[in-house]
Amino acid sequence: KLKMLKNFLYNKKAPNISLGGSFILTDQNGKIFDSSKVNLKKLIYFGYTYCPDVCPFDLLKISKIFENNPNLKKEIKPIFITVDPERDTIKKLKIFMENFDQSFIALTGTSEDIKKVLKKFKIYVKINKSNPIDKDYLIDHSSLIFLLDKNDSYIKFFRPNELKRNIALN
């Protein structure tokens, strides 16, 4: 355990952590996206388009990093995965992503597809509906950003406020 902690603290790949992996979802243009076919590292953020504050703010921070460091786009693919496939349709994602760097890809899928990906990353999600047919609701979810290697293996996670200083180190 001490070795694992030291590896994490010194920004090395932590051994024996089962997070991440390949996934297939649908992008904001309606095309199938297979993460295993992307020969870049992946920076993954989970959120939803109806989020009133945190998600758009975090995505804007990620977007600015890529806008200000164009060479990162040759190494890392920024990815937004919805935790709200019921409301985050392909059309909604396409409009939403117009606010961010063009290198970003937004992904959705069926509820089952999204649940599988959430499980791979151990993402906590709680939908706060006042009744089952409520369409205006908030979602509590993990707010972490994951970095995967070219083979979709976990490298590290960041909290949004740690991203800028750590992204260059990986």
Task: Label the model's feature ranges.
Residues 20-21, 41-42, 142-144:
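Short loop/turn microsegments at loop-to-beta-strand junctions
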Residues 24-25, 147:
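Hydrophobic beta-strand positions
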Residues 61-72:
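Short hydrophobic signal-anchor/transmembrane segments that target glycosyltransferases
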Residues 94-142:
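Short, internal strand/loop/helix patches
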Residues 130-170:
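Thiol-/selenol-based redox modules, centered on thioredoxin-like
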